Amino acid sequence: MIGVIGVKRNVDIAIREKLALYPKKHKKYVGELLNSFKEVVILNTCNRTEIYFNCTEEISEDEIFDKIFNVFNWNDDLKKYMFLSKEKRAVTHLMEVICGFHSRILGEDQILGQIKDAYKTAISDNSISSELQKMFEIAIACGKKFKTKCKMFEVPVSSVSISINSALLKGCRKFMVLGYGEIGKLAIKHLLSHKVECIYLIVRDKSKASDLEGEIVEILDFNEKNHVINEVDCIVSCTAAPHTVVRNEDIKTEGDIIHIYDLAVPRDVDKELSEKERVILKDIDEISKIDDKNKKIRKERMEEYKHIVEESIEEFLNWLKIREVSSKIRNIKIRENEICSERIKTFSNKGNGENAKLAERMIKSTADAYVNRAIELLKSEALKGSDSSCAEIIEKIFLT
């Protein structure tokens, strides 16, 4: 059984923080999950916590929740904020997620890269090998095709772009970006495309961003951030830290207005900062509600190409159905070869060499024609969901 357990949409950030996973514990999580499930993929982003699994034996929904909650040491009171989808619903969920239908910013395409990373990590961890591997391969192809066909770059919108556009409209010109992961890189790229006065990039390892050092970009480590934090008029924070990185005492009470956009989950910024008159603080939930004229255009375009999602769902479900009869097909081919060998051997003992070769070709050709037709019929019935009676008849003909 294929399934996914994750945080429901529109759950408050205060709850999502309690369900966030820490990357440093990833190996431990996977090892423990594989004690209960055949395959596992963990999708852990600033806005999404989902565990995809495949189990070979029947297991109740309560057992699934218990096993997963025990691994992550989550409080049972949080179960009401989680969803569980199985089989086709789980497949549909992944295909829609990778195309941006479930993103807080509709159509935000960072999720495609995040799912690709989760898939590569699962391959590296040897935590997928069959059904989940195929499902993620088809999903990634689906996401790429959807992104190409929709041409979302023509109507860009993301938590990063919305935050920075909002700040620019408010007159911000001096920026600080905390973190240089995928979101941080997008923030820097977006800022460099506008006429801003300066950008302070705060990182733990300066060497990873050394190519950015220039006229308006200054790279500092976290120990140096407070030297300049009160000089900027906008902070974009997007680290993967499990703790607060911008504390209440870091920002002076007196001074010009400072806009802070906290894109992280768990939150990077002390929420008490919003009590200071000079601070305008928005977390990821508030950012996703900022009106953007491109949202409506993107929604219409996404609906136009939703057939790509539906086709990918069907492709995977058909693969599953064919896979179920693959062992029967192998057995039929093996039996075909055995029968052909017996007949050819019998004829070879009776005829001359040249006739024997001709007979071998004819016997093999005739056998292939009938066996291939039987296999086509078996696959066709499998796709219709009525392969059991067909398989029984074919087995009686070829395997008994």
From Swiss-Prot:
Q: Which GO terms describe its biological process?
A: protoporphyrinogen IX biosynthetic process from glutamate
Instruction: Give the note.
Output: During catalysis, the active site Cys acts as a nucleophile attacking the alpha-carbonyl group of tRNA-bound glutamate with the formation of a thioester intermediate between enzyme and glutamate, and the concomitant release of tRNA(Glu). The thioester intermediate is finally reduced by direct hydride transfer from NADPH, to form the product GSA.
Site Important for activity: give positions. Answer: 93
Q: Organism source for this protein?
A: Clostridium perfringens (strain SM101 / Type A)
Record-listed substrate binding positions? 45-48, 103, 108-110, 114
**Comment on protein domains:** Possesses an unusual extended V-shaped dimeric structure with each monomer consisting of three distinct domains arranged along a curved 'spinal' alpha-helix. The N-terminal catalytic domain specifically recognizes the glutamate moiety of the substrate. The second domain is the NADPH-binding domain, and the third C-terminal domain is responsible for dimerization.
The UniProt entry, under NCBIfam families, shows: hemA (TIGR01035)
What keywords would UniProt list here? Answer: NADP, Oxidoreductase, Porphyrin biosynthesis
Subunit field text:
Homodimer.
UniProt protein name? Glutamyl-tRNA reductase
Q: Which residues cross the membrane?
A: none
